[in-house]
Amino acid sequence: MVTGGASGIGAATCRTLAAAGAQVTIADIDEAGAEALSRELPGAAVLILDITDEAAVNAAFARIRALDILVNNAGIGLVGGVEQTELADFTRLFQVNVQGMFLVTRAAMPLLLPSHGSIVNIGSVAGLVGVKKRFAYCATKGAVIAMTRQLAVDYPAELRVNCICPGTVDTPFVDAYLEKYHRHEKEKVRAELNQRQPIGRLGRPEEIANLALYLCSAEAEFVTGSVITIDGGWTAG
């Protein structure tokens, strides 16, 4: 199962896992996007799910018979420093990025533990370093990293739990940011985003998905509790 699976990194992960033979469940609140992707992936299931709704999450997982892999990818962003951040926006970010991951993970545990499954959480370099004007977002991604490590400590023999921390990746998430905050200078700001990463470009969703595939595979049996950056060198210096 991939949450936020209808677009961006989530969609790329669904495609990559399906190509490797996984029976994928695309979990997303975006019904049209999830259905469109499912038509590309024979055998893929669609789960329309608001991950912040505890009752809906519990009911959804009660209907699932087996689960080997959970990719917690769903998330939202917010631009603003501490002085520009409203409590309602701060709370909403934590509801989706942190509480949502908690609810899904908790509901999935009765399925993942018997299968000795794997959880991959999609964090961000924003959880590792300060990013200007991303106060709430940095806080939520720091929490994702902490939850990853804690789960790995609690379940060392039964479950593998890892976190991927991407830099800026070329997804609809970035497109929406440019449209909302830089409508009249998109290309200029996109160029700045490229240069923020020493490699000189944005990441590709498929690159994140390939790392997720590795972490879910038997080749990564010795990998748990790890926080892995894939950021074009952003955090190297």
Where are the language model's segments positioned?
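Short, small/polar-rich loop/turn modules that mediate ligand/substrate recognition or access, typified
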Residues: V71, P156-R160, V223-G225
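Active-site loop-to-helix junction immediately N-terminal to the catalytic Tyr of the SDR YXXXK motif
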Residues: T85, G130-C138, Q150, Y177
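Residue(s) in the substrate-gating loop at a strand-loop-helix junction
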Residues: S124
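Active-site helix of classical SDR
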Residues: T105, T140, T148
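Short C-terminal tail/terminal secondary-structure segment
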Residues: V129, L213, T224-G237
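Alpha-helical segment proximal to the catalytic Tyr-Lys
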Residues: P110, A152-A157, E221
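Substrate-binding pocket helix/loop in short-chain dehydrogenase/reductase
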Residues: G81-V82, E86-R92, L193
